[in-house]
Amino acid sequence: MKAVILAGGLGTRLSEETSSRPKPMVEVGGKPILWHIMKMYSSHGINDFIICCGYKGYVIKEYFANYFLHQSDVTFCMKENRMEVHEERAEPWTVTLVDTGDDSMTGGRLARVADHIKDEEAFCFTYGDGVGDMDITATIEFHKQHGKQATLTATYPPGRFGALDIDNGRVNNFKEKPKGDGAMINGGFFVLSPKVLERISGDDCVWEQEPLIGLAEDSELMAFEHQGFWQPMDTLRDKVHLEKLWSKGQAPWKMWT
């Protein structure tokens, strides 16, 4: 199965960190948060990634092009124009980086990678700025069992995200960003059928609006309830919080060894 990760946004609320790099390349524990998200998926056996690039996408391309320089010790033989990598730390990943435009919205970015996912039975989809101890394997199995077009992970963070009305796993209503009312919210980890691509109207389409609302209205959106840790990195305060968890060895999203 493939995982599509949105990595093209400006990250305006993290402007201190994103003036020279896209938000998913902001580091936690010396590694881009994008790396942490990919490690989460990889710990569940998902190693084929489609990265939706946009703002300063070349930074992401350069990171993967020089991955071993970031991860390993190296020796440069200047005379022979040769580089030797020591203790090469490879990941079992296939990474496809797609330029989805500087100004495309979330739905538009997903539509722009359609050629890479249209023949899949299902695929994972998430944002490049949130981590958690989600049971991705169980979410995929839940999606296969109910047979609907879309599954999202529902969780309980602060009330500034899209609230869900859930009945026996089925999402009856999707409301974007209400003021906190204690409802479960969209945690941003999806399993989707390629049929959802038909609901995206173009580059200006916001995934969290017409497509998700329409899926809920058509009884095609299901929720896998997550009771554990989830944290988006929207602000500098969020970044500091994640850094503290990582530095103390208390990062719940670190499900790999």
What are these regions (language model features)?
Residues S20, A90-P92, M105, M184, ...:
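A generic fold-level signal
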